[in-house]
């Protein structure tokens, strides 16, 4: 009798041997991959790892490289920039400013409210006072007064009376 050999179970199937064609194809693939190893042709002169052009395009450029701003080579004096003064309101002639104040809608509305007997807030009242004071100043500069119209009417009435008395 033969000594019994360990029994092989069906679970451990024998590995299939590759055919000569399959072995040759695998060898060709390995050789092709081995040929591709190393640097790309011309990489020594071109200077680097840029195997494909897309690599350089995706990388963000360093802003410090290639600045086009001129750099002074000699010692130069610093040019101090003069700050422009903030634009102030253009100076109007007293006559133009007076006309603007007389046609001011907000001032008219607040004065009408005052005449109607309403009380204004402290802020509104101070604004009205400031505007009325400015109108007084301008009228004094221009030599006008509130009573000019009334005086003219009185002067005309007196002239009319004088004409009547003279008998013209």
Curated annotation (Swiss-Prot):
Stretches with biased composition (Acidic residues): 146-158
Residue ranges, annotated region (Disordered): 1-99, 143-168
One of the GO biological process terms: ribosome biogenesis
InterPro entries from the UniProt entry: YihI
Protein keywords: GTPase activation, Ribosome biogenesis
Residue spans of biased composition, Polar residues class: 48-57
Listed Pfam families: YihI
Biased composition (Basic and acidic residues): 19-29, 159-168
GO molecular function (one): GTPase activator activity
Chain intervals with Basic residues compositional bias: 9-18, 30-39
Subunit structure, as described in the record: Interacts with Der.
Function: A GTPase-activating protein (GAP) that modifies Der/EngA GTPase function. May play a role in ribosome biogenesis.
Family, per entry: Belongs to the YihI family.
HAMAP family: GAP_YihI (MF_01058)
NCBIfam families: PRK05244.1-1
Name this protein carries in UniProt: Der GTPase-activating protein YihI
Organismal lineage: Bacteria, Pseudomonadati, Pseudomonadota, Gammaproteobacteria, Enterobacterales
Gene name of this polypeptide: yihI
